[in-house]
Curated annotation (Swiss-Prot):
PANTHER family: RIBOSOMAL RNA LARGE SUBUNIT METHYLTRANSFERASE, S-ADENOSYLMETHIONINE-DEPENDENT METHYLTRANSFERASE DOMAIN-CONTAINING PROTEIN
One GO location term (cellular component): cytoplasm
Domain (PUA): residue spans on this chain: 2-81
Residue intervals passing through the bilayer: none
Protein origin, superkingdom: Archaea
Keywords: Cytoplasm, Methyltransferase, RNA-binding, rRNA processing, S-adenosyl-L-methionine, Transferase
Protein name: Putative ribosomal RNA large subunit methyltransferase MJ1653
Compartments in which it is found: Cytoplasm
Major site of localization recorded for this protein: cytoplasm
Pfam families: Methyltrans_SAM (PF10672), PUA_3 (PF17785)
């Protein structure tokens, strides 16, 4: 018989708003929660006995998989993966896209990215971990040739699972993907794995603002996503990143797109230090792109993260002559707060900023609740005050 867990008003309210991760703190009968095995199916009820959802117990939380009383078995996993894939195909995605985006696709704690015939898998739900073989079998049935697992980081630890990186099926470890007119080499080797698919729409949008001969600074450029799109439109690009391996791949991506070597330069270094040096040297760029890693993965880290974002954007605004493209993938930082801090940072840099466009994550990362929206991307016109 499935264990019944009752939640307080905070837990009830969270589920009503579409948040399907319920911390142990919101569970009233904690003794029952503690007594069952990790990975077991549990039913969530309100204090008054209203059924709210069904999911898997994890060490510190329950990850709700469904709001119905249905079996969370192998067929459930298989059907939801197939349905999630069909949804992307209906949206027009073909070869490269996020196939499964955790709770948005009723597979809470599972992320699958597809790169042609290679898929990467991330699992941070103990219940899904127990059915990993089904995930692999389903992907193979859908025509995937090779599967690479990259289950690591904070969410993996919360699930009480060891970090795992390696091939689950097949032998391929690299492929070439197409994004608009741009091509990118994507590798799967345990260090810099995959490609940030969530920025697809924003990278394509960037091309509309680039003019022939523009000087572009791409901060935290990774493997050159924004850089390549800018270069394709005739820009001269300077990319900055801490990872030597990522920058090597960025250079390969420039070569792959037949960009002359005198039109790009990649600098290995700390973004803040490099930008400070550029400011001291009086450097200016027509376009500055800021796409840093998440500064805050929890609300506790938000205060220091805001300071970091403010400094980064202040430096970026000082260096930008015409356009500032700035991003944040910190989920706890809300869109309005991000807009406000960017505008303030521009003012502190003596720049008058006008928001041209606000972008979010690509639609293959569907937003179904506040908790599933994380990416923010602002396009701003900037001019001297």
């Amino acid at each position: 018989m499935t264990t019944k867990l009752y939640v307080d008003f905070g837990g009830y309210s969270a589920i009503e708003k579409g948040n399907l991760i319920i911390p142990r703190d919101n569970i009233l009968n904690k003794e029952d929660f503690d007594s069952i095995e990790i990975g077991e199916v549990v039913d969530i009820y309100s204090k008054r006995g209203k059924f709210l959802g069904r999911g898997f117990k994890n060490p510190k939380e329950v990850r709700i998989m469904t709001l119905r009383k249905e079996d969370l078995d192998e067929n459930y996993i298989r059907e939801k993966i197939i349905k999630a894939n069909e949804y992307r195909l209906k949206l027009g995605f073909k070869d490269t896209y996020r196939m499964v985006y955790t709770q948005s696709d009723w597979l809470n704690g599972l992320v699958i990215d597809k790169y042609n015939d290679i898929a990467t898998v991330q699992i941070f739900n103990y219940g899904i971990e127990k059915m990993k073989d089904v995930v692999v079998e389903t992907l193979l049935d859908l025509g995937i040739d090779s599967i690479y697992e990259k289950s690591s980081g904070r969410n993996r630890k919360r699930a009480g699972l060891p970090e795992v990186e390696g091939i689950l099926a097949g032998e391929k470890t690299e492929t070439i993907i197409q994004e608009g007119e741009a091509k990118f080499k994507v590798t799967f080797d345990g260090q810099k794995t995959g490609f940030f698919l969530d920025q697809r729409e924003n990278r394509l949008e960037l091309e509309k603002f680039i003019k022939e001969g523009d000087r572009v600074l791409d901060i935290c450029c990774y493997t050159g996503g924004f850089s390549v799109h800018a270069a394709i439109r005739g820009a001269e690009v300077v990319g900055v990143d801490l990872s030597k391996k990522a920058l090597k791949l960025a250079e390969e991506n420039m070569e792959l797109n037949n960009i002359p070597k005198d039109r790009y330069e990649f600098i290995e270094g700390n973004a803040f230090k490099v930008m400070e040096e550029f400011i001291e040297d009086g450097e200016k760029f027509d376009v500055v792109i800021l796409d840093p890693p998440a500064f805050a993965q929890s609300k506790k880290a938000l205060k220091s993260a805001i300071k970091g974002y403010h400094m980064l954007n202040r430096f970026g605004a000082k260096l930008a002559d015409r356009l500032l493209v700035t991003c944040s993938c910190s989920q706890p930082l809300e869109p309005d707060a991000f807009k406000a801090l960017v505008i303030d940072a521009c003012l502190k840099a003596k720049k008058w900023a006008k928001i041209i466009k606000y972008g979010s994550q690509s639609p293959d990362h569907p937003i179904t609740s506040k908790g599933t929206e994380y990416l923010k991307c602002l396009f701003l016109s900037v001019e001297e005050i």
